[in-house]
Amino acid sequence: MLRHLVCCFVGPAFLILSACQEYDFKVNDKIVYTPTPLFRDYAIPDTGLNDCVKQAINDGTVTTAPQLMSLDCSFAGIEGLEGLSIFTGLKALRLSANQVRNLVELSKITTLEAVYLDDNKIIDPVPLYGLAGLRDLDLSGNPNLQCPKPGSLTQVASTVLPQHCR
């Protein structure tokens, strides 16, 4: 009888609770579980980038800045990257087909391993030179890019440059 009670009531209760991870849970009017709030302590002026980061935080239930490890903001109309460096855990960043020009903010995210900046308006790749962990880099489709000097991206295993830099 006890086994039947456990199977019929306790098991489904735990199943329901696991689906309610975003809500306070009360027993006898006492809160027994409060979820950690999502990370919101950042300021990103670019609307496209801000919306993309907000969505990534919601999708990944990110509660601290370093927890955001991957971000895909392709085709988002992004022009500026200011404020992105608060996400110190970023390893993969995809910003394909935007209007990005300045990469200084990326130089502060030393955890980056893969950066896709194809089809933007980048001119100066120098801020990427100091990213020691960078392994994959795509700068194709940036017609005004100042071609990286030989040896400046030796740490990068895979580099895709615009046609005029090949």
What kind of feature is each model-predicted range?
Residues F14, D41, S70:
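A residue-level signal for beta-strand positions that form part of recognition/binding surfaces
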Residues M1-F9:
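Bacterial N-terminal signal peptides that target proteins for export
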Residues V27-Q55:
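Surface-exposed cap/linker segments adjacent to membranes
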Residues I16-A19:
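C-terminal motif of bacterial Sec signal peptides marking the signal peptidase cleavage site
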Residues V32-T34, N58, T63-R101, E105-R166:
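Concave beta-strand-loop units of leucine-rich repeat
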Residues C7-C8, C52, C73, C147:
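Generic recognition of cysteine residues
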Residues Q21-Y23:
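Bacterial signal peptide processing site
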Residues A13, P45, S158-T159:
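Residue-level signal for mature regions of secreted extracellular proteins and peptides
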